[in-house]
Amino acid sequence: MTSGNHIWDKKEVYEYINDSDCLVRPLNYPNCNWGSGYKIFEVQGVKIAVTNLLGRTFMAPVDSPFEALKNLAEEIKDKVDLIFVDFHAEATAEKVSFGYWAKDLGVHAVFGTHTHVQTADEKILDDKTAYITDAGFCGAFHSIIGMDVEASLKRWTTCIHDRLDVVDSPVAQFNGVKFKFNKITKCCEQVQRISFVKNFSEVI
């Protein structure tokens, strides 16, 4: 599981992440932070490195995600078969630029996150690297990026920033992306967006 700029919002994660074998914090946070900025998983004999980096445009100051990924790719490229990157960023131009940078470093897939809105620009860069600007989110369908509609509207119409709560609703949307790779060349052959809505109140 990758994370993002809210990774430290709950204090419970401080100790948990050190013992977790599946939770990744942003790689370009300071090294003194808890946890690790990448993990290596083996799936059906294929070693996959998964890392998470934060963008810097309209975000809190962090180390360069470009340099952080370059250093990581050089360190692990001979140890794994595939490298997947979750780039948690706000600006589209920064995300697209990062995709091309990652492609030149030998990364196999880059999927953006953070905006909670799935984009329709899935592509394969130079017949090698899978890319999508934002994979979207999983959460309440009748919401404003997962948050309560009335509270969100109050923020926009009154400039009063009350607490925003996650909507508890039986109608949920599911976003994601699926990649298909060539077993021999390791190049991506297909990028497929996943998006559907399910009403759990109708489930018996």
Please provide the spans of the model-predicted regions:
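Acidic, metal/ion-coordinating pockets
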Residues: 2-204
